[in-house]
Amino acid sequence: YFARRAFGPGNAIARSIAHVSSNLDAPVSIDDLAARAHMSRAAFHRKFKQATTMSPIQFVKSMRLNTAAMKIAGGFTVNEAAMDVGYLSTSQFSREFKRMYGQSPRQWGAAHHLPSGVA
């Protein structure tokens, strides 16, 4: 939805964002995203960064961590949330989560717990 509003439905970057958001649990490669957008890797990276202010990998990581944060707030365990958004290692997920949010996933979940059915 965000991507369509920001870039229009036919935009290659918008399609890439939609693909990533629909497949957060799957491995993502820049080469695959560039091929889907019919661009070279360098052109895709440049256009993606112009459109989002983040590199494609930073954007994917941010989407995954944001989605996981909402799942944790909604009652998922840290492990469930990490696996659900494509992390194979809970420790790597926890390190990256803490880097982005300034606290561990457990601390964040305790401080941001949502009533059941909201997330």
Regions found by a protein language model. Give the residues of each.
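A short, glycine-centered helix-capping/turn motif at helix boundaries
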Residues: 39, 75-76
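Short, basic, alpha-helical segments at the C-terminal edge of helix-turn-helix-like DNA-binding modules
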Residues: 60-69, 107-119
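Short helix-to-turn junction characteristic of helix-turn-helix DNA-binding domains
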Residues: 20-23, 71-75
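Basic/polar phosphate-binding segments, predominantly the helix-turn-helix DNA-binding elements
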Residues: 2-3, 9, 19-21, 27-63, ...
